[in-house]
From Swiss-Prot:
Role of this protein: Endonuclease that specifically degrades the RNA of RNA-DNA hybrids.
Compartments reported by the entry: Cytoplasm
Keywords: Cytoplasm, Endonuclease, Hydrolase, Magnesium, Metal-binding, Nuclease
One Pfam family in the UniProt entry: RNase_HII
Source organism of this protein record: Bacillus subtilis (strain 168)
Name used for this protein in its record: Ribonuclease HIII
UniProt EC number: 3.1.26.4
Cofactor: how and how many bound: Manganese or magnesium. Binds 1 divalent metal ion per monomer in the absence of substrate. May bind a second metal ion after substrate binding.
The keyword Ligase is annotated on this UniProt entry: no
Family listed: Belongs to the RNase HII family. RnhC subfamily.
Amino acid sequence: MSHSVIKVSLSAIDQMKMTYSGSLTASVPQGAVFQAKPPGCTITAYQSGKVLFQGKNAAAESARWGTAEPQEKKKTAKKPADPRYAPPADIAGMSVIGSDEVGTGDYFGPMTVVCAYVDKTMLPLMKELGVKDSKDLKDPQIIEIARNLIKTIPYSLLVLKNEKYNSMQEKGMSQGKMKALLHNQAITHLLRKLDGVKPEAILIDQFAEPGVYFNHLKGRDIVKERTYFSTKAEGIHLAVAAASIIARYSFLMEMDKLSRAAGMTLPKGAGPHVDEAAAKLILKKGASALRTFTKLHFANTQKAQRLADKKRS
């Protein structure tokens, strides 16, 4: 598909939104200001000022607004600074425990951490089930694949609900430390489930340098043997991709529960649409309700409160 990306000011984005008002979509992707679908093109404008044009008329439509940015090279996985924790070159064919988390950047909803064990004999089946980087999958695909995975492979799931998350954060614990604790705990649980089966490697989708990760775990029993780290680990071994899919599935199920409790659909992400939803929740249930539904330390809390105050006046 032909595509083009331009960078414009927020005022230009407002002008674009007015221009395409007749073709705006009802919902927008995470982080987007608007999405429109004029003939032959899908236009998505983001809060960063970047605007993505896709479709046969992408070049012509983007030329109305600015010069396309040069396309960036696809980012590759980043290995940790300490080579001891870089995954082996042949890890893709090994029996591996993969660990990943979801929900850390979402204002509404919990943090879910999953580690999953994929024996090398199961790798062909993982591909057959459609296991791949969860960012390339839509929610209905995530749900379908995850429901097959949880019946097929050993895994450990931990859900850090919002009230507990907020309590830990208010006591001074960083999100990075929470993630380290949950990953280590999930891996420990799964190793117990495996009952003596030894994975050839443990691969964690890297969110901190290994030294920082292990420092967060001081004073605790740490799973360190054959443990490796890499960013974009979903593309390195299918165990991490499987863990990410199950974690995303769990997050979606938790969001459904929270939406039912709130009496409204709670959106993913942390953009302006989330501020609006949080303001609506404040007006409906009071500001104290946010503790149950959100990560309070996000800037969205103050923005939502201001919006709610404006709506009241």
